[in-house]
């Protein structure tokens, strides 16, 4: 789950890799935080509770003003301090601060990215689901596709594709429930 944040313009984009290409998907939902008076100690930081809705989920965050950052994990930001812990109300996703340390410059080697919207992302995801190993395009180019198991036996590509499809269906619990893809 990678994101690219531009704080001056308040622009946030998810980075999704599909068949070797990095796609930038804009996050356009505004986080409207409800800051409560509830406080607790998280690690060594005095933290305050806040709640918001994002992606069809309710999120409970704990932030601290003891650190000079107003940011958080993934797309989460906009509180008057650093988010040290955040989880959705169903306990399906959680992010927790492990450590704060001074680092060097962060360099991202991505040189070519393609900007897409959620509709295009859904098209790509469905395409991947329907042909997880991109077999059809390889066959059109005159290539053959085979899988060899750990025992050296060649495996049927349709069985491998079905296994991948089952895995996609089993793991189909995105952070953004409002963009969940119904693959059937």
Where are these regions (language model features)?
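Extended soluble regions of mature proteins
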Residues: 1-184
């Amino acid at each position: 789950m990678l994101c690219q944040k531009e704080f001056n313009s308040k622009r946030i984009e998810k980075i999704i890799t599909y068949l070797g290409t990095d796609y930038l998907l804009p996050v356009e939902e505004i986080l409207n935080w409800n800051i409560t008076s509830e406080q607790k100690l998280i690690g060594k930081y005095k933290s305050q509770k806040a709640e918001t809705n994002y992606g069809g989920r309710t999120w409970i965050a704990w932030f601290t003003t003891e650190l000079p950052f107003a940011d958080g994990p993934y797309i989460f930001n906009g509180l008057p301090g650093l988010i040290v812990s955040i989880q959705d109300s169903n306990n399906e996703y959680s992010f927790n601060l492990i450590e704060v340390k001074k680092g060097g410059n962060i360099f991202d080697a991505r040189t070519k990215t393609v900007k897409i919207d959620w509709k295009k992302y859904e098209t790509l995801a469905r395409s991947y689901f329907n042909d997880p190993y991109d077999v059809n395009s390889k066959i059109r180019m005159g290539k053959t596709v085979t899988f060899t198991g750990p025992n050296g036996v060649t495996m049927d590509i349709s069985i491998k594709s079905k296994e991948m499809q089952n895995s996609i269906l089993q793991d189909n619990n995105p952070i953004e429930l409002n963009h969940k893809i119904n693959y059937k």
